[in-house]
Every structure is written in C-alpha cells, then in structure tokens.
A protein has these predicted regions:
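Serine-dependent amide/ester hydrolase catalytic core
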Residues: 2-106
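Structural helix-boundary/capping segments
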Residues: 33-60, 68, 106-151
Length: 151
C-alpha cells in the first residue's frame, strides 16, 4: 500500500486485513457486510439485476433533468449535522442520514456538499450540488456562490 493508511502485517493478506480493520470505521464495515450479504449466493440475482435496472433508469432521469437545469440542488441530509460522536452507536440513524446522497452515488455523476446556513440547533445544514458528467467547473462555481451567500 503506497497511499493512505497502512498497517503492517507478516504477509500481504495480513497487512490488507489489518489495514482494513484499522482504516474503516464501524459504519463502513456494516455497509460492506450488508452489501456482501445482498450479493451472496441466492441474493445476487434477486438484487443485483434489479439494482442495475434502477441505476440505468435513474441515470436517464438525471440526463433529462440536465437538459433543463445546469445543476441540481438537494439537501445533503434530512437533518442538520450531528455533534461529533453523537450518533456513532446508532447505525440506523447514520444510514438514514445519507439517504439524499444515494441517487448521485448510484448514477456516478459529480456531486458535492457545502454548508449552507445553520439549523435552530446551531449545527450546519448541508446542500448537495449535482452536476452532469464532466461539468465539475460549473458545480464548483455554484458551490462557491452558495458558500458566499450563506456567510
């Protein structure tokens, strides 16, 4: 491993295992396990084929939207940011709070989140900017404008 975290081991397999054990938080490990289970024998055909179809349909819908709009805006999360460490032992809340980012992740289009004001609890509100493929410069311009407007 020449980039990122590297945890030593007596051989390559042990090094990879140690690095992944130390480098991934509990939430990432849970999601990897869920994905592995869903794609395991008996579930692959039931879920993977349907997921590919949904992904294709979503991508087509996004392309249609980009014919009318330069970028799309959405909340990044259904609520404000949590205080550091506040929800680490609540996996369902952690999962639900990135629900707004799933469409952009599925279609593989550029997306980013920027802070846009604060909620009544004083915590930041995130707005997600989604752009067509290869239109990152437009996305960055919108992000900059939103950040300037919210200061």
């Amino acid at each position: 491993v020449r980039y990122g975290l590297r945890v030593d081991g007596s051989n390559l397999e042990e090094m990879n295992s140690n690095t992944r054990t130390e480098g991934f938080g509990d939430e990432v490990k849970r999601r990897i396990m869920l994905g592995t289970y869903a794609l395991s024998a008996g579930y692959y055909d039931a879920y993977y084929g349907k997921a590919l179809k949904v992904r294709r349909l979503l991508a087509e819908n996004f392309i249609d939207l980009y014919q009318k709009y330069d970028v799309l805006l959405s909340p990044t999360s259904p609520c404000t940011a949590f205080k550091l460490g506040e929800k680490v032992n609540d996996p369902m809340t952690m999962y639900v709070n990135d629900i707004c980012t799933i469409p952009s992740n599925l279609v593989g289009h550029p997306a980013m989140s920027v802070p846009f004001g604060k909620g009544s609890n004083g915590m930041p509100i995130g707005v997600q900017i989604l752009a067509p493929p290869m239109q990152e410069p437009v996305m960055y311009q919108v992000a900059h404008a939103l950040e300037m407007a919210s200061e």
